[in-house]
């Protein structure tokens, strides 16, 4: 495996600024077990706690401990049973409901024994380093259609939010993709259904490593059930998996390099809490590295303009150049969404130079979040929108 060397990085940046692998990549035989051991060792060195959890009971027990620690609250046994059965492992909820819970409803209400209510965070999105990361491997599920044993899973506050499937070097990467596909069909839903909380999947054969959202996999299952067979690329296909990269868009394919960048704790937590979008169509999208870089550079420019009193000047501006089909609308949506949460931002304006772009952009924004944007046809409407304090994000 290559050696990783960070040339330039910022504690605030999700994507490493520049990286340069040293040494030649090993093509020597390495078993899947050896690759898995090396991966877990590297995660442990990066601050992940390794746990020997191989069954549902141990996973649920650890989940209770981690949620108690995150929320600084000890459940009674009766409270935990109610909260787990209704809020976490509800038999009527599937992958989409659980994705919505993580992305939009991560604070759940506990009904306490004394009749009062308490907010319980599943994940802390404001202070990401309050979240606790653990790694488990060879988890076994025996209550599905078939017995399955999963490779490596990342737990965030006890919930499995990232799953990694490995193949030995030389094996086609798509085999790992197909294996996760089988797990979804046969066993992720089984038992308490906690593996339906997985937001991001990572597949690697050591030499090449990619990631994708749970919707990429889940859509494939639904499409098969509906009897659809499409020749073109769809969002559920292997082609919609993504490589990780540095800020210069240099791909980081090797598992060691990928682990030191993508699985850096602040990077992974930022991706999970900021750079996933659960759309109005109930699909989960995870942004690509160049989209994250563009978003953070725009936000950084806004911060600098505010801190150095450059608002309203040319120095406060800038531009991002992305090619056709690169997902510019999604980048602009996420940028606007995050910018609107800044305490000194009241309104975010999005200006296009063609009417067809206006319609297309509004349609896409509505897909990302219903009612997220308001269009206008003349300056009178624009004036009313700007003067309407009720629509300011901090007044909602």
Whereabouts are the PLM-identified features?
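Acidic/polar loop patches that form or flank catalytic/metal-binding clefts of enzymes
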Residues: 372-379
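ATP-dependent helicase/translocase motor core
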Residues: 2-347, 356-372, 389-393
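Short beta->alpha hinge that forms the Motif I/post-I loop of the SAM-binding pocket
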Residues: 353
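Conserved motor-coupling elements within RecA-like helicase/translocase cores
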Residues: 381-395
């Amino acid at each position: 495996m290559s050696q990783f060397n960070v040339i330039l990085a910022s504690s605030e940046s999700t994507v490493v600024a520049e990286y340069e692998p040293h040494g030649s990549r090993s093509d020597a035989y390495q078993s899947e077990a050896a690759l898995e051991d090396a991966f877990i060792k590297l995660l442990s060195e990066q601050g992940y706690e390794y746990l020997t959890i191989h069954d549902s009971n141990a996973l649920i027990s650890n989940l209770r401990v981690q949620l108690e620690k995150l929320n600084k609250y000890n459940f009674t046994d009766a409270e935990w049973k109610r909260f787990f059965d209704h809020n976490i492992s509800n038999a009527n909820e599937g992958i989409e409901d659980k994705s919505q819970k993580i992305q939009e409803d991560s604070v759940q209400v506990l009904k306490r024994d004394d009749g009062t209510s308490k907010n319980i965070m599943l994940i802390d999105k404001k202070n990401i380093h309050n979240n606790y990361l653990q790694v488990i491997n060879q988890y076994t599920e025996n209550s599905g259609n078939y017995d399955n044993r999963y490779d490596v899973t990342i737990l965030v506050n006890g919930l499995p939010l990232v799953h990694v499937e490995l193949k030995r070097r030389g094996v086609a990467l798509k085999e790992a993709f197909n294996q996760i596909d089988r797990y979804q069909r046969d066993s992720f839903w089984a038992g308490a259904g906690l593996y339906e909380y997985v937001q991001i999947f990572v597949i690697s054969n050591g030499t090449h490593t990619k990631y994708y959202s749970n919707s990429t996999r889940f859509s494939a299952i639904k499409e098969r059930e509906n009897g659809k067979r499409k020749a073109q690329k769809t969002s559920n296909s292997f082609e919609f998996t993504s490589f990780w990269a540095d800020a210069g868009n240099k791909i980081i394919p090797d598992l060691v390099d990928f682990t030191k960048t993508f699985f850096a704790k602040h990077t992974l937590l930022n991706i999970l809490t900021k750079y996933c979008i659960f759309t109005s169509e109930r699909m989960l999208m995870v942004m690509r590295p160049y989209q994250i870089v563009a978003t953070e550079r725009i936000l950084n420019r806004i911060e600098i303009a505010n801190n150095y009193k450059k608002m309203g000047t040319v120095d406060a501006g800038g531009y991002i150049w992305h090619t056709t089909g690169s997902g510019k609308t999604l980048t602009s949506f996420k940028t606007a969404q995050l910018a609107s949460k800044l305490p000194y931002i009241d309104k975010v304006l999005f200006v296009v130079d063609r009417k067809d772009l206006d319609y297309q952009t509004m349609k896409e924004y509505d897909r990302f979040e219903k009612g997220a944007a308001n269009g206008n046809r003349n300056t009178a409407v624009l004036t009313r929108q700007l003067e309407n304090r009720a629509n300011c994000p901090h007044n909602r």
